[in-house]
């Protein structure tokens, strides 16, 4: 878009701006009072999810105007372009085809003359062979012992997605197989890895090196340390050439879009899994990057995860905008950020299995839409992605809910919970106790969203209270209920947020599939590391950076 045709100049945007002037002082409690059936009109179901958007500060008229904005941005055509494999990642001139990773084997998707589905399922078949070999106790280390621990070495999308899903689906770990424990190490300082290396048996430890480019310094630093650890303990420090070869073959799997770099590093081609340049890192858990998930829950459950995401893909593609879950979720965010000036967003799962979901969404949303330049290179004169953070809701109640209830910031909240849990606990007494705990958790989830909406009016007594015991309410929130937390509903939940991000990016006219800010950080860090090591070139830096380096060098000289 040129400056004159940017979305904020559109009739739909201008109509929303005018409409917002009359909505800013409207309290949520009055919206429910003035229109019976408000909840039903702003609630939708799909793919095992119930999406309640009724606690946002909007009316039917608001949604009608937001849908007009989406159509003004050609959203329906954008959805087609995304799922058809057109080049929607404009800065890198390629498709963004994470949806292809969850297509069923009988599907066909021809992208630039090539059907990508067979390659996707060939990779899944290779993953399955590796998983079955581990679960049969047949993947053996250099000494012939079966692998018992798998450590995923990755960062960002190669870590957060697999970590989140593996934790969320821990209940689905297969019980009739050789047990393999899954671990994650991402920090470049080596602290996570160091803990594992003091506790694990090198003879039974397998490392998965996950890096799209296979140049990420965080991952390769950990990988080099892991390799040296194995060589020292299993191959006489690497001097035993025969054992060195066996160690490299049996203790490393590589996952990357760059097979030649995996081979250069020493990973056996038979133990390499590939993915493609058209899959962004933060969208990659659906393919080979998801190997730790498959090792944790088995391939059958991994395929159910894909099926749930694909169900949401079809919903996103085929459902009219006014009933489309990702579209409606995205429009609620657009309304809050761009028209009500709500620029903070908290993710609050009420289920301990979703402990890492907020961290996962931090990357998905802020790395995707934390942009200030349009696809045509114009500076955006409007806000884009809000600051997003979160924590398990029950814990957050004792951490930052004080700010939500009585602070000065307007914050949009997403409450997420499964409706049913613990149905399959065998012992009746234990099942009853756990179900009571789940009921308590659901009560807190619903109650907190109610208090954030109503403020003082949620309290049973209308007796006068001092100011420090007053609650203003009027904080917007979404409540997402899963029928159950299963591989299928989790897949749908993740895909829901992926598509929400795409909808917002389309309206803001930004590219959600690049991350040039991340690339700049890597470049500057590499240059700084060279100066730190050589003690030359500090004069090119700013005064603060030179001062900090001096502190480090003085400490090094003192030891």
UniProtKB/Swiss-Prot annotation:
Q: Which GO terms describe its molecular function?
A: carbohydrate derivative binding; glucose-6-phosphate isomerase activity; monosaccharide binding
Q: Which domain of life is it from?
A: Bacteria
Write down the chemical reaction(s) this protein catalyses. alpha-D-glucose 6-phosphate = beta-D-fructose 6-phosphate
Keyword Nucleus annotated:
no
* EC numbers: 5.3.1.9
According to its UniProt record, where is this protein located?
A: Cytoplasm
The active site of this protein is located at 367 (proton donor), 398, 522
Q: Name one GO biological process term.
A: glycolytic process
Q: Does the keyword Cytoplasm apply?
A: yes
Pathway(s) it belongs to: Carbohydrate biosynthesis; gluconeogenesis; Carbohydrate degradation; glycolysis; D-glyceraldehyde 3-phosphate and glycerone phosphate from D-glucose: step 2/4
| Pfam families named among the record's database cross-references | PGI
Cellular component, GO annotation: cytosol
Q: Which UniProt keywords apply?
A: Cytoplasm, Gluconeogenesis, Glycolysis, Isomerase
Quote the function comment for this protein.
Answer: Catalyzes the reversible isomerization of glucose-6-phosphate to fructose-6-phosphate.
Q: Which PANTHER family does this chain map to? A: GLUCOSE-6-PHOSPHATE ISOMERASE
Q: Which family does it belong to?
A: Belongs to the GPI family.
This protein's name: Glucose-6-phosphate isomerase 2
- Gene from which this protein is expressed: pgi2
């Amino acid at each position: 878009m040129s400056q004159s045709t940017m979305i904020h100049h559109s009739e739909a945007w201008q109509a929303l701006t005018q409409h917002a002037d009359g909505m800013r002082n409207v309290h949520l409690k009055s919206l429910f009072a003035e229109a019976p059936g408000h909840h039903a009109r702003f609630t939708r179901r799909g793919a095992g999810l119930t999406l309640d958007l009724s606690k946002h500060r909007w009316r039917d008229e608001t949604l009608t105007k937001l849908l007009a904005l989406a159509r003004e941005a050609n959203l329906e055509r954008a959805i087609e372009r995304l799922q058809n494999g057109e080049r929607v990642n404009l800065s890198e001139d390629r498709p963004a085809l994470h949806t292809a990773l969850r297509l069923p084997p009988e599907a066909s998707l021809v992208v630039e003359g090539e059907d990508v589905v067979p390659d996707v399922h060939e990779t899944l078949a290779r993953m399955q062979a590796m998983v079955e070999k581990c679960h049969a106790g047949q993947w053996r280390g250099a000494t012939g012992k079966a692998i018992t621990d798998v450590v995923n070495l990755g960062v960002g999308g190669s870590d957060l997605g697999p970590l989140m899903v593996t934790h969320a689906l821990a209940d689905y770990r297969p019980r009739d197989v050789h047990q393999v424990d899954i671990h994650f190490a991402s920090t470049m300082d080596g602290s996570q890895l160091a803990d594992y290396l003091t506790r694990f048996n090198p003879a039974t430890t397998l490392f998965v090196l996950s890096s799209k480019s296979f140049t990420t310094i965080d991952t390769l630093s950990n990988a080099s340390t892991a390799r040296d650890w194995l060589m020292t303990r299993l191959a006489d420090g690497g001097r035993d050439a025969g054992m060195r070869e066996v160690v490299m073959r049996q203790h490393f799997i590589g996952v990357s879009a760059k097979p030649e770099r995996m081979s250069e590093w020493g990973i056996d081609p038979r133990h390499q899994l590939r993915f493609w340049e058209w899959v962004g890192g933060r969208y990659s858990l659906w393919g080979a990057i998801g190997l730790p998930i498959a090792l944790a829950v088995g391939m059958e459950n991994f395929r159910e995860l894909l099926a749930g995401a694909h169900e949401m893909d079809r919903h996103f593609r085929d459902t009219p905008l006014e009933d489309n879950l990702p579209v409606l979720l995205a429009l609620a965010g657009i309304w809050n950020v761009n028209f009500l000036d709500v620029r903070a967003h908290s993710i609050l799962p009420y289920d301990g299995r979703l402990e890492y979901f907020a961290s996962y969404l931090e990357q998905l949303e802020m790395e995707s839409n934390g942009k200030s330049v349009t696809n045509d290179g114009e500076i955006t004169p409007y806000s884009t992605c809000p600051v997003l953070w979160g924590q398990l809701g029950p814990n957050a109640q004792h951490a930052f809910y004080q700010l939500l209830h009585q602070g000065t910031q307007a914050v949009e909240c997403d409450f997420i919970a499964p409706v049913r849990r613990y149905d399959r606990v065998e012992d009746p007494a234990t099942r009853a106790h756990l179900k009571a705990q789940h009921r308590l958790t659901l009560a807190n989830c619903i109650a907190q969203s109610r208090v954030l909406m109503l403020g003082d009016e949620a309290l049973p007594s209308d007796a006068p209270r001092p100011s420090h015991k007053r609650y203003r309410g009027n904080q917007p929130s979404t409540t997402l209920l899963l029928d159950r937390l299963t591989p299928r509903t989790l897949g749908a939940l993740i895909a829901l947020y992926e598509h929400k991000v795409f909808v917002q990016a389309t309206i803001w006219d930004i590219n959600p599939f690049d991350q040039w800010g991340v690339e700049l950080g890597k470049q500057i860090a590499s240059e700084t590391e060279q100066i730190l090591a050589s003690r030359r070139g500090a004069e090119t830096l700013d005064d603060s950076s030179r001062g900090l380096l001096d502190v480090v060098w003085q400490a090094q000289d003192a030891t």
